[in-house]
Structure formats: C-alpha cells, structure tokens
C-alpha cells in the first residue's frame, strides 16, 4: 500500500494505467482542482474531509456534498481532525470524536445532497467513464 498524495491529472492517469484502484489527491486542493482531477481518471478518489492539526488542520465538512457531487465515485476520508497527528493511533476519545465527525458529514450529505448514496464495494468502477462530469 502506498501512502502518497498526487495533485495533477497526468500523475492520476499514470497511476490508473499502473493498476491503481483508487487515488488519494493532495489534501488541500480546491474543489475546482478536485473536479478537474476527477475528469482525468475513472477510478474512485479518496478525498479527505478533514485532517489533523499537524497536517494542516482543515475541516471541509460543509464542502462534503460538493466533493461528492463533483468527485463521485469517491471515498470520503472522515475524522482525521480528531487525531493529534497523521499516522497516530486513535485513543477511545479520538475514536468517539471521529465517529461524531462522520455523523456530521453524513448529516451535511443528507441535507444538501440527499440523492447521494453509498455504493457497494466495487460498484463505483467504471461509473465515471459513463457519467457526465461537470467542472
């Protein structure tokens, strides 16, 4: 497993051609950048909705519906802001805060993008090639 983020369409295409089944964009890309990257590949994207303070400390809860709209199929990575640093093991209290953050993101999705649904494992493959991607 490779833990490295990428931020341009050429590297996304290369990763897909090399067999990547999902791609993790750089954490702090704008929505416009994420939409453009989505247009370059058909594999799901792994997009962080938040990150630990030691890695920038951003929280994109209110952007989650728009991330899903422009990046689907997408795996939202939720709850990292509860951790002290990237890669640290969560405590029981951290896990509770991570679950709370996930519930808040789900609430935002239900409120602002109710038509979104969670796909079954593997169901997202090939969807992008068939869908219209609006940037």
Task: Kindly give the residue locations of the regions a language model identified.
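Generic hydrophobic/aromatic pocket-lining and core-packing "Φ" positions
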Residues: 9-12, 34
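Conserved, mostly hydrophobic/aromatic
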Residues: 15
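Active-site-adjacent beta->alpha loops and helix N-cap segments on the catalytic face
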Residues: 27-42, 56-59, 91-95
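Alpha-helix-loop-beta-strand connector modules within alpha/beta enzyme cores
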Residues: 34-52, 100-108
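A conserved mid-domain beta-alpha-beta active-site/ligand-binding segment of alpha/beta enzyme cores
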Residues: 47, 58, 69-98
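C-terminal extensions of enzymes
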Residues: 88-135
């Amino acid at each position: 497993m490779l833990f490295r983020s990428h931020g341009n369409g050429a590297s996304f295409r290369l990763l897909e051609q090399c067999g990547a089944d999902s791609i993790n964009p750089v954490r702090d890309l704008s929505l416009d950048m994420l939409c453009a990257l989505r247009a370059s590949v058909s594999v799901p994207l792994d997009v962080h909705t938040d990150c630990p303070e030691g890695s920038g400390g951003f929280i994109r809860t209110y952007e989650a519906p728009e991330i899903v709209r422009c990046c689907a199929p997408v795996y939202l990575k939720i709850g990292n802001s509860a951790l002290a640093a990237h890669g640290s093991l969560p405590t029981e209290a951290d896990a509770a805060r991570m679950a709370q953050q996930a519930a808040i993101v789900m609430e935002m999705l239900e409120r602002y993008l109710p038509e979104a649904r969670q796909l079954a494992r593997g169901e997202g493959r090939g969807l992008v090639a068939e869908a219209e991607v609006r940037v």
